[in-house]
Amino acid sequence: MTQSIVHVAVGVIIDDSGHVLLGRRLKGTHLAGYWEFPGGKVEPDETVLQALDRELKEELDIRIGATSPLIDVKHDYGDKQVWLDVHRVLEWQGTAKGVEGQPLAWVGIDSLSEFQVPDANAPIMAEVRKLLTSV
């Protein structure tokens, strides 16, 4: 049986003090308890940036402005295949909050390794480390 690939828009948000935003997956979700970059599924009628804006509004109550492509990650979890279409969010409006009840954390480079992330997020973490090192 062929699995379909879930296309996911992901946002890397770094604040002015060089901290990146992570959210914790809620109980009852795939990979519950892991920390991840915010985002969600791209719907058939959306572009990646439309999906990212919608998801960050739903999850964090922020609207995105300028973004730049960061990395594409394809990963097979065995029970699910994902394509993470990752963009750095350069501008946003509002203050991020866990609208869906998810804990949020602004994390500095020295603390990144303390946060357990899904395997598909490992390449994103490597890119974020590069970004935070250059801040």
State where each predicted segment sits.
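Short secondary-structure junctions
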Residues: 59-66
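Conserved N-terminal beta-strand and adjoining loop/helix that marks the start
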Residues: 1-20, 41
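NUDIX/MutT-family hydrolases
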Residues: 88, 97-128
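Active-site-adjacent beta-strand/loop module that shapes the phosphate/pyrophosphate-binding cleft
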Residues: 15, 63, 72-95, 105, ...
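Generic C-terminal helix-cap and adjacent flexible tail
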Residues: 1-4, 129-135
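Conserved Nudix-box catalytic region and its N-terminal flanking loop in Nudix hydrolases
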Residues: 19-58
